Every structure is written in structure tokens, then in C-alpha cells.
UniProtKB/Swiss-Prot annotation:
A molecular-function term among this protein's GO annotations: structural constituent of ribosome
Cleavable signal peptide: none
Disulfide bond residue pairs: none
Protein name in the entry: Large ribosomal subunit protein bL32
Coiled coil residues, start to end: none
Gene: rpmF
Recorded family membership: Belongs to the bacterial ribosomal protein bL32 family.
The entry's keywords: Ribonucleoprotein, Ribosomal protein
InterPro entries for this protein: Ribosomal_bL32, Ribosomal_bL32_plant/cyanobact, Ribosomal_zn-bd
Gene Ontology cellular component terms for the protein in this record: large ribosomal subunit
HAMAP family: Ribosomal_bL32 (MF_00340)
Biological processes per GO annotation: translation
Organism: Prochlorococcus marinus (strain MIT 9515)
Length: 58
């Protein structure tokens, strides 16, 4: 005979949700930081190909 599972508490549900939201917020913060550093030209971990036209303009 089918028996329903025990209900998990709201506290556990909220804790799992908070952990998930925290990880998402951290990933979003890293993405924003990386985007800002790329836009300002301060990114050290990227190598950009330089076109010949850009070299002649400078």
C-alpha cells in the first residue's frame, strides 16, 4: 500500500533555498566583476588579438 513520505520542515526547505540563492548571488557577483574589468581594460587574464588597423591609428 502506498504511504506518503514524511513531510520535510519549512526550515530545511528554506535553508536549501538560501544556499542555492547564495551560490547564485556569488556567481552573479563574479560575472559582474569580470565584466567590469574587461570593459575598463584592467583584466589581466585575457589576451586580445590586435588588428593592424588599430596599430596604425595609434
Amino acid at each position: 500500500m502506498a504511504v506518503p513520505k514524511k513531510k520535510k520542515s519549512k526550515s530545511k526547505r528554506n535553508h536549501r533555498h538560501a544556499v542555492w540563492k547564495g551560490k547564485a548571488a556569488l556567481a552573479a557577483q563574479k560575472a559582474i566583476s569580470l565584466g567590469k574589468s574587461v570593459l575598463t581594460g584592467k583584466a589581466q587574464g585575457f589576451v586580445y588579438p590586435i588588428d593592424e588597423e588599430e596599430e596604425s591609428e595609434e
